[in-house]
Amino acid sequence: MTLIVEAKQRLGAFSLDAAFTSEGGVTAFFGRSGSGKTSLIRIIAGLARPDGGRVVLDGERLTETTAGIFVPKHRRRFGYVFQEARLFPHLSVRANLSYGRWFAPKAGRSESFDHIIDLLGIETLLERSPAKLSGGEKQRVAIGRALLSSPRLLLMDEPLAALDEARKAEILPYLERLRDETEIPIVYVSHSIAEVARLANQVVVLSDGKVQATGPAVDILSRPSAAADRKEAGALLEGTVESFDARHRLSTVTLKSSQLHIPSAVLTPGRPVRIRIPSRDVMLATARPEGLSALNILEGRIEAISPGEDGTVEIRIDCAGDAILSRITALSCERLDLRPGKTVFAIIKTVALEG
């Protein structure tokens, strides 16, 4: 699947001028509120006409302003999941799901009803009414309804934004299964770096209506400038589960040339995982420290130092091929005489396993 988007649109004082190309998987639009994420996904969906630009899916021109082409939203065969589930309150879960089948061409019904309800874990909900569902359950049903329409592309506009942390934790594993077990490309809108780090293959960073960066999630989310909130800056690494210590509930994850020990549930050896290390949780030392409770200490070489905010600096460290970010005070940087090329030891206080 190849999706090409070029869009210009003026909305009052706000101006959107964005372009990107996606080759499938999960492409995440990431940025602060008001950055243009929803405006852009609405143009892709056919819910809004751009003032200029084009939307092309696998060579088919869905929008091209110079040629006067605009395929209506109902003919694009895109699934759309909103912040709110928007289920029909008078229909059961089963009937809501069946409604999605009305929009699937008979020749294109690639996903069976049973497979979808198993994928989303909604077998026990089929006879309930939407009023008797939790927020997370409603969103899973809404996703199922969209999938049963056999979409060529699934658009998800902040589907977890209205949920509390417990409901988000409930639904994220199902979104991972959706990503891994179907071939449906997804455009996913979020301002949560944790969601994007866990789900996305490609990231498009938007700011003030313009694309600031685009590329693989591991590369983009490891840049200090990518975080919508400075507190969220950090490194995203890919690794493989080496082993699981049942006694201490620790997984050993092998990176390119290093290993990390991470508190986790039982993980199968050989499983690929993503690891997020917030820059605020990485301390630096110029000699290998001893007598610390920290389990993860990596040796590396400083690649770059950039000024941060409020008297801080962001330091990028190459740890045998894995890039780690550390945010420390400018005073600490001066006292340790830190500079590019110097060897340091990164003391990692917190590691988040992103799935």
Swiss-Prot record:
GO terms for molecular function: ABC-type molybdate transporter activity; ATP binding; ATP hydrolysis activity. One of its GO terms (cellular component) is plasma membrane. InterPro entries: AAA+_ATPase, ABC_transporter-like_ATP-bd, ABC_transporter-like_CS, Mo/tungstate-bd_C_term_dom, ModC_ABC_ATP-bd, Molybdenum_import_ModC, Mop_domain, P-loop_NTPase. SMART domains: AAA. SUPFAM superfamilies: MOP-like (SSF50331), P-loop containing nucleoside triphosphate hydrolases (SSF52540). Coiled coil: none annotated. Residues 291-355 form the Mop domain. Signal peptide: none annotated. Its main location: membrane. Keywords: ATP-binding, Cell inner membrane, Cell membrane, Membrane, Molybdenum, Nucleotide-binding, Translocase, Transport. It is found in: Cell inner membrane. Belongs to the ABC transporter superfamily. Molybdate importer (TC 3.A.1.8) family. Part of the ABC transporter complex ModABC involved in molybdenum import. Responsible for energy coupling to the transport system. This is Molybdenum import ATP-binding protein ModC. It comes from Rhizobium etli (strain ATCC 51251 / DSM 11541 / JCM 21823 / NBRC 15573 / CFN 42). The lineage of its organism: Bacteria, Pseudomonadati, Pseudomonadota, Alphaproteobacteria, Hyphomicrobiales.
